[in-house]
Amino acid sequence: MKKFQGVVQFIHPGGEHKVDSDGWTPWNLTMHKRKFMSVTGSYIDRSERVHNSLIAFWGEWEGPSKRVHSWTAEPQLPTNLVAPVFPGAASRIDGLQNTDPYVFGNKFHYTLCKQSRRDGRTTFLTRLEPGSLILFGSRLQEQFVLDTVFVVDDNIIPHNRLTWNEELSADVSETFRSVTLDPMYWDKNVSDEATHSLYSGAHLDSRFHSMFSFFPCLPYTDPERARFVRPVIDIPSVINHKLQQGQKGTELVPEQTKEIWLQVVEQVRNQGLHLGIGAVEPSISAVPDHVLPWKQGMGHTSES
């Protein structure tokens, strides 16, 4: 089947996860949402200097999280700043959501969402060429807002329900396996016939055509200065502001893709944000039982 080289506008749900009265958000069993998170990470400022500090950013983490700070609700701004928490390996249960894309640890990863249909047919998202650019974001107030920029590097690993454990074990962390791969292949809606692609994101130190993956962020020193709306990206040749779900793929040659990437960088920076290039992976931490659905009798557990 034909490979895809170019830019993908990828729409995923943009709503913010709620936080319970005790400050916790349980592992998600419902629709994917975003979280406004604080972790130790790395970012590049406008002068191209790399900083290591606490950062705040919008992203996906469907595992448990703990509130760090809260604000009065305002349109498009986050209501809660949360810290992602890794409780250790999950237990198999229907509906357990996976984290995809994944921006924590040594590499960004993307491996499931919209790559296949329930009947086993795969989409063009399994056939991305190295150097392709994925702009993950959401449609809010009739505009496309960005949370993750993913530059596909040349380490692409195909996998399916029969092969994933062997094919991917050497290339992913235990945390990624637990919060993304295990829930993915526990999901009965993921076809046995479909072969997915595990993509890794090009990093600052291993750029692809001078491009690297990043997420818009700010340093977190003062809660009132770290809060931000997701940046609007307006590039008519590749962005459709009317797109409410799904993806738009625009085939481009590598030089054109790089030009789009540069425009995205400029627009993110012009909205007062920095380029987050790394987020420390959450280490195993104790959590209350009520944030783990398999300890609450929710859904249906089954043997692996």
Predicted regions and their residues:
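Short beta-strand-centered aromatic/proline hotspots
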Residues: V145-I157
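Short N-terminal edge-element motif at the start of the domain
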Residues: T72-Q143
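Contiguous surface segments at macromolecular interaction interfaces
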Residues: M1-Q76, P158-S304
